[in-house]
UniProtKB/Swiss-Prot annotation:
This is UPF0194 membrane protein YbhG. The gene is ybhG. Keywords: Coiled coil, Periplasm, Signal. HAMAP family: UPF0194. NCBIfam families: PRK03598.1. InterPro entries: CusB_D23, UPF0194_membrane_YbhG, UPF0194_transport. Residues 141-210 form a coiled coil.
């Protein structure tokens, strides 16, 4: 009679174990079994000279691997070297003019200006006296009206010359005006800016690789005359390599930034790459047709950017990738 309760107890224990195991299995499938589908997303960039000119040489061809800082091509430098020399000369002239403005006038120049005033004063005094005499002769009708007018004109011209000499002496003694000094300084700064631009233009006549990558296309050949910004090369950036994938709202909580995942390709199904979620879009969108999830194409999903941490040259632009979530992704 005692065996029946024991059997019932054992059955309850077994049933509880089965239920617990099933729940654990279900949870593990929910937490670790998420699979997404995406594509390799390698960035490309068009490289060009920032200035125009005739292509002098190109150092790389399609398929070549390039390194950041590597010289890829050069334009004819001669026009930019000439422009640089002209800009340097312009700075020298502007600097000299500015220095003169700051220094003011020399004692010799002031003395010459004072002598010019004395000379102009003597000439004016003579013309004024002559005009006074002519007025007396005109009253006695000894000279004609035309003679008197000529004397007045000579007197006025001498007076204008005297005033000009006096103004010049006054300026020499007081130095250059602040406005003139400011204008000379502005001219110098403009010349310096033109020099900096000329130096930059010469530098930009050499095309430098901005980062590591692989040359996809070579659009021009030596001898081609390019406008500024014309594409010379198209480069595929080898690092970083991303995978673009999409997750629905139901599984969004599993796709958190920093989460590690495994990435499988058709070429190596038994040797996954490792990745880490770097970005999750804050807004939902319809799944693009390129993603191989027919059952989700009508759903709203969130875009993921997964950085491949052990990428190699086997990963190509657009290659389909299976993204596997699970605890093993963080341990392999």
């Amino acid at each position: 009679m005692m065996k029946k309760p024991v059997v019932i107890g054992l059955a309850v224990v077994v049933l509880a174990a089965v239920v617990a195991g099933g729940y654990w299995w279900y949870q593990s499938r929910q937490d670790n079994g998420l699979t997404l589908y995406g594509n390799v997303d390698i960035r490309t960039v068009n490289l060009s000279f920032r200035v125009g000119g005739r292509v002098e040489s190109l150092a790389v061809d399609e398929g070549d691997a390039i390194k950041a800082g590597q010289v890829l091509g050069e334009l004819d430098h001669k026009p930019y070297e000439i422009a640089l020399m002209q800009a340097k000369a312009g700075v020298s002239v502007a600097q000299a003019q500015y220095d003169l403005m700051l220094a003011g006038y020399r004692d010799e120049e002031i003395a010459q200006a004072a002598a010019a005033v004395k000379q102009a004063q003597a000439a004016y005094d003579y013309e004024q006296n002559f005009y006074n005499r002519q007025q007396g002769l005109w009253k006695s009708r000894t000279i004609s009206a035309n003679d008197l007018e000529n004397a007045r004109s000579s007197r006025d011209q001498a007076q204008a010359t005297l005033k000009s000499a006096q103004d010049k002496l006054r300026q020499y003694r007081s130095g250059n005006r602040e406005q003139d000094i400011a204008q000379a300084k502005a001219s110098l700064e403009q010349a310096q800016a033109q020099l900096a631009q000329a130096e930059l233009n010469l530098q930009d006549s050499t095309l430098i690789a901005p980062s590591d990558g692989t040359l996809l296309t070579r659009a021009v050949e030596p001898g081609t005359v390019l406008n500024e910004g014309g594409t010379v090369f198209t480069v595929s950036l080898t690092r970083p390599v991303w995978v673009r994938a999409y997750v629905d709202e139901r599984n969004l909580d599993q796709a958190q930034p920093g989460r590690k995942v495994l990435l499988y390709t058709d070429g190596r199904p038994d040797k996954p790459y490792h990745g880490q979620i770097g970005f999750v879009s804050p807004t939902a969108e319809f799944t693009p047709k390129t993603v191989e999830t027919p059952d989700l194409r009508t759903d709203l999903v969130y875009r993921l950017r997964i950085v491949v941490t052990d990428a190699d040259d086997a990963l190509r632009q657009g290659m389909p990738v299976t993204v596997q979530f699970g605890d093993e992704a963080g341990h392999e």
